[in-house]
Regions:
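Hydrolase active-site cap/lid region
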Residues: 148-192
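Structural signature of beta-strand start/N-cap positions in the alpha/beta core
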Residues: 97, 137, 160-161
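Short, flexible hinge/linker loops that cap or flank conserved catalytic cores
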Residues: 40-41, 64-66, 132
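An N-terminal hydrophobic leader/cap segment in hydrolases
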Residues: 3-50
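Short gly/ser/thr-rich secondary-structure transition/capping motifs
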Residues: 51-56, 188-192
């Protein structure tokens, strides 16, 4: 009987730990100070978007002369745009402008992250892009965790194209493969 109580206590302890610290498992952000200076071999503009709830989203925006459109790149769940900016080169060399944002809690972006806020932030920037580009000139590119965000934003709009790089079928399904023994559906706060 004592083994059963001990086993149940360990199980409940794991579930509680996972629930309260799940962000440590899913996100590996690199935080940057506001005065950090990005360095890339091609010209860019740094943008800051102040969100209605007090959060702020930091982005980098590369432009080319006579652009064919813009690639809106939604990165994965690690580091910051400091290390992801290298992906701009391929698109710039093919005549596309390139915009990439950091999610809340990554890089210079600030605020509490949630699934709803990530989607709303990404949608806000998409709408900002439509002030300069018609939707048939916007390409949404989602990589890894960002593929879920890109797919959602694409479903709300009509971009020219949606590109998914190393996507996943279901965030819940991917996590459930490893911790199938937990009531995961009720434990996850972020299920992009």
């Amino acid at each position: 009987m004592i083994w059963l109580i001990l086993l149940l206590s360990l199980y409940l302890g794991f579930c509680l730990f996972f629930y309260f610290f799940q962000h440590l498992f899913f996100f590996r952000p690199e935080k940057l100070i506001k005065s950090f200076q990005y360095k890339y071999p091609f010209p860019f503009e740094e943008l800051d978007f102040d969100m209605e709830d007090g959060g702020s989203i930091n982005a980098i925006y590369f432009k080319v002369p006579n652009s064919r459109g813009v690639v809106y790149y939604l990165k994965g769940n690690s580091k910051s745009i400091k290390g992801w900016g290298k992906f701009a080169k391929d698109f710039l060399s093919n005549g596309y402008d390139f915009l990439m944002m950091d999610y809340r809690g990554f890089g210079k972006s600030r605020g509490k992250r949630s699934q709803e806020k990530v989607f709303n932030d990404a949608q806000y920037i998409y709408k900002w892009l439509t002030q300069s580009y018609s939707e048939d000139k916007i390409v949404l590119y989602g990589r890894s965790w960002g593929s879920g965000v890109a797919a959602r934003i694409s479903s709300w709009n009509k971009p020219r194209m949606l590109i998914l790089d190393s996507p996943y079928f279901s965030f819940f399904y991917n996590i459930n493969r490893y911790i199938f023994f937990t009531p995961l559906r009720w434990m996850l706060e972020i299920c992009a």
